[in-house]
Each structure stands twice: as C-alpha cells, then as structure tokens.
C-alpha cells in the first residue's frame, strides 16, 4: 500500500511505497478486496495456490490523491477464476491447516466440475428415462423397470401396435387383434370339418366313385340316411302305393307269370306206361 505522511516543515507530502517483496504486495492487495474475518492478511501460501488458478485478468489502479507526485501505476492481479478454481480455493486453504502448516504437495487433488464423468451422468439420466439401452453396471437398473410390452410383436404380421393382443399358436398374447380373429375363424372351420367327417364314418357311409357316362350315374340317387334307405319309387314313404310295379319286379329279379290259357287250348296228354294197354 502507499503510505502518505507529511514532513515537519516543508508542508508538502510525499508518497513513499512500502518496501517489500512482490508477494507481500500481492498479499496486501488481495487482502484489500477479500478481507478476512479476523483482520489478518491473506496467507502467502493461499495466494500462491490461488495464483495457479488465475485467469490473468488484471486491474490497474492509480494513486488515490490527484496531487500525488508519483506518476507510476500499480498492477495488481485479482483471482477472478472459473467456478472450478473457486471450488478449489477452500480446499487449498484448508489443506495447510490440516497438514499443520506443511506445504501442499504438487499432486494434491482438487475438486473440479471437469472431473465429473459425463458418461456416468448420461447413463444415470438415460436409465431414469429409459431412452436408450444402458451398458455396464447400469443394465441392472434399466432392466428392473423395463416393460416387456414394448418389445412384443405379432407372430404373424410383426406389428407392435394393436388395441388388443390375442392368443395364438405360439402362446398367449402372441397375435395382434386382426391376426387373432383370423386365426380363430380358421380354427373353428377346421373343427367343423373334422366333426362332419367323423359323423359320416360312424354311420358306415362309404362314397363310391361312379364311372363317368355310365347309365348307373344317370339313375336317380336314393336318399341315404344313417341306418336306412328309402327307394325313390315308393310314393309317400312306406305303406303307400307302389309306382311302376313292373320295373320294381324286374329290379327284384321276379319273372312275371305266363298268360292264362284260353278255352280253345288243348293240353297234350301225358304218356304213361299204361298207354299201350
């Protein structure tokens, strides 16, 4: 600091700079802007530590009195550092006290925001948001809150969005709504076909392939039911009149009787053993 004092008889004042090392001047200048609570000056060790984080911003001050005979200016360096250096200053100030006045080693670690792993921060963020798959140790945390519905796809068409999941051949809720309805219809149709085939085989019905162009194929088919057969030539089912009896007799292999002998017909005599007697 610059000390002002008046000489005894001259009546003029002189500015005398206090002699000292550059470190003392920097310490006193730093104490001017950042006074300590107990009134003491800033420790030189703290000034040296803060100088390591200095961003080289300077402030030039002029003498306080305009009538001063001194024409020079004093350059004092202020520690207006970055947030990382501001965080490191309390640690650097507390380190000598913890070491009982011993100098701080050069490799003393400082707390800095730059040392924070952005990968760890990003992994913790994405694990909470479930925006991307996490790797490493964050897989367990991401897998705990993972929803299996997000990875579900239809086994038939491969879609992932459907209003309703239906059961399919690959298990429950393996088909989308449209594919599940189609699969259900085909399953019912196949079951109905199997039931019809089983009923026809139980009655002993055997379908014979008829020859093309044969007369038997042109005949009127009989109405076949399970266990009985009704002829199309019987009118009224059973117990009614028989239509086309001659054709029915021929069908039953019955030969009709011969015509009745007239009165003029002569029956021949039979030859016997007593014919010549």
Curated annotation (Swiss-Prot):
Keywords: DNA-binding, Flowering, Metal-binding, Transcription, Transcription regulation, Zinc, Zinc-finger. Gene3D superfamilies: Erythroid Transcription Factor GATA-1, subunit A. InterPro entries: Znf_GATA (IPR000679), Znf_NHR/GATA (IPR013088). A zinc finger (GATA-type) spans 154-179. Residues 58-74 have a biased composition (Low complexity). PROSITE patterns: GATA_ZN_FINGER_1, GATA_ZN_FINGER_2. Residues 52-94 are annotated as: Disordered. GO terms for molecular function: sequence-specific DNA binding; zinc ion binding. GO terms for biological process: floral organ development; regulation of DNA-templated transcription; regulation of timing of transition from vegetative to reproductive phase. The keyword Hydrolase does not apply. The keyword Transcription applies. Belongs to the type IV zinc-finger family. Class B subfamily. Probable transcription factor that regulates organogenesis during transition from the vegetative to the reproductive phase. Regulates the expression of CYP78A11/PLA1, HD3A and MADS1 during reproductive development in rice. May act upstream of CYP78A11/PLA1 during panicle development. Acts independently of the photoperiodic and gibberellin signaling pathways. This is GATA transcription factor 15. It comes from Oryza sativa subsp. indica. The lineage of its organism: Eukaryota, Viridiplantae, Streptophyta, Embryophyta, Tracheophyta.
